[in-house]
């Protein structure tokens, strides 16, 4: 039932004229990577409230602002965005700010209570990667390449 609701939500999002991708991702230049200090939003961009977008792979990062592991994963996220922005839809979910309904659905369905949490969905919404903790960029790039070649 939950999977069906998410798929329906994704279909509606695909056909909705209000479906925009987060764009212009920027890493907060004041991040202290060695501490759990609260340095503000780790990643900023336009339409930061976007959620899943059907039709291409999706990379989702769920993080907290005061987590040094999240800060390091945020840096990797922006590097991946710079390389794959035209091929992959990026979703950034900051647990310290209000979320859109689309983002809240992703948190409810996939977030396991540990940050950072990284999720990669294929173009149809099927999870290809769904883990908490830091993940190296090459692991995600391999998943992107496999998904993009299908």
Where are these predicted regions, by residue range?
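Structural micro-motif
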Residues: 110-119
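Thiol-based oxidoreductase modules, predominantly thioredoxin-like and allied folds used
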Residues: 86-101
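N-terminal "domain-start" segment that seeds a small globular fold
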Residues: 20-48
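Short active-site neighborhood of thiol/selenol oxidoreductases, capturing the structured segment around
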Residues: 53-65
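N-terminal signal peptide c-region/cleavage motif recognized by signal peptidases
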Residues: 16-18
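Non-catalytic, surface beta->alpha helical segment in thiol-disulfide oxidoreductase systems
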Residues: 122-150
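Bacterial N-terminal signal peptides that target proteins for export
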Residues: 1-8
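Typically the conserved alpha-helix immediately C-terminal to a functionally engaged Cys/Sec
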Residues: 71-83
């Amino acid at each position: 039932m939950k999977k069906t609701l998410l798929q329906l939500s994704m279909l509606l999002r695909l056909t909705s004229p209000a479906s925009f991708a987060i764009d212009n991702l920027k890493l907060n230049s004041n991040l202290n990577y060695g501490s759990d200090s609260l340095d503000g939003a780790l990643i900023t961009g336009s339409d930061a409230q976007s959620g899943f977008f059907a039709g291409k792979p999706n990379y989702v990062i769920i993080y907290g602002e005061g987590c040094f592991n999240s800060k390091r994963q945020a840096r990797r996220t922006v590097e991946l965005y710079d390389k794959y922005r035209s091929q992959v839809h990026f979703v950034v979910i900051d647990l310290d700010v209000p979320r859109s309904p689309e983002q809240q659905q992703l948190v409810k369905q996939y977030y396991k209570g540990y940050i950072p949490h990284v999720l990669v969905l294929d173009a149809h919404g099927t999870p290809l990667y769904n883990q908490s903790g830091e993940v190296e960029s090459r692991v995600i790039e391999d998943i992107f390449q496999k998904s993009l070649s299908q």
